[in-house]
Amino acid sequence: MPLTIYTGGAKGVDTHVERLCHLYGHACVVLIPPCHPRAKSLVPLTQSDLDAATPTVTQVAFRLGRQIHHSISLQYIQRNYHVIQPASLVLALSHFDEYRKHLLGGTGWSVVMLSY
């Protein structure tokens, strides 16, 4: 049964997942914010798409006790909302900080978004 895989289009795991989807006949939807370098070759999310994620991102920030200090970081976390939202199965890969208490990058945010 063909699957639809949602990815954020980053180098590394996301790129590998895109190749595997094409190899095995699965659909791959690459969701990126307008600031992403690949936005020229793919259709990026619109600002209204990103804004739709803001209420959930705000709740997740409160739950994690974290703040977003850069608009580009915000766009990537908003993008992750659109990767997580339609998912029935999530495979999250990341690195822990040196104390193994926090996931680095936006992956931790995405995992918490699963409960919203």
Regions found by a protein language model. Give the residues of each.
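Acidic/glycine-enriched connector segments
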Residues: 1-116
